[in-house]
Amino acid sequence: MTEQRRRFIEIFTGLDRAYGQTESRSKNENGKLEAKSWIEKQQLTEQKWEDHLDGKEPSLGIIPIKDDNTCTWGAIDIDSYDGFDHKKLIKQILENKLPLVVCKSKSGGAHVFLFVKESVKAVDMQMKLTEIAAWLGYGESEIFPKQIELNPKGTGNFLNLPYNHPEYPTRYALDDEGNALDNLDMFITHYESKVVSNLGMVAIKKKERENTDWKGAPPCLVTLASRGFAQGSRNECLFQ
């Protein structure tokens, strides 16, 4: 195994007694790539990592929460299909100086990763990413880790990993200009520029002016109010 691949494994370390598997299929009428996914309740081996990076199916998914209820990474899963504007998202992240890595996901949306050098409590990672997702305007997106603690037989939910092929990955990171980082060397360099020592280094920029009309409202509604409601979204926002 190459040094780059070993580093990739270190970056995405998670639960090692279970892992996810995903088998790709064709796109449905909404443009989403359909797939069959399941969890294997057995020890994760190096061969599974190798198979994933070699482009062999099924591809690999990792459960970020470990048996001690900590993790070294988490992600916001923005589930969108063809036409998602990754560059706009990256610009928004950079404007607020958030140390996040954006990857194109299987569906064409984005996996927005937050990496830390030392393990943190899964509950703290989940809370931080929930706050970030709401601030970015994606408060309804799934957050990984989805669990804050595991029982001895529990497995949690997995997230599909990027770099599912050495030459033609469909899931890969994007740099600060939105360009594809289509190999592990480029990804690792980008990771090193974003990883933080602890979650205290990840600060959400406060709004310049408090809107007292929305004081006490959920973060997702405060974000929507500050940016304006899209045409036709009034009823949906009222429902929220």
Where are the language model's segments positioned?
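DNA replication initiation on ssDNA origins
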Residues: 1-73, 80-89, 155-158, 163-166, ...
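Short beta-strand
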Residues: 62-65, 100-107, 142-145, 151
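Short amphipathic beta-strand starts and helix->beta connectors
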Residues: 53-62, 92-100, 224-228
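Modules that initiate DNA replication and primer synthesis
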Residues: 27, 71, 78-81, 87, ...
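Conserved NTP-binding/hydrolysis core of motor NTPases
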Residues: 100-101, 109-111, 132-133
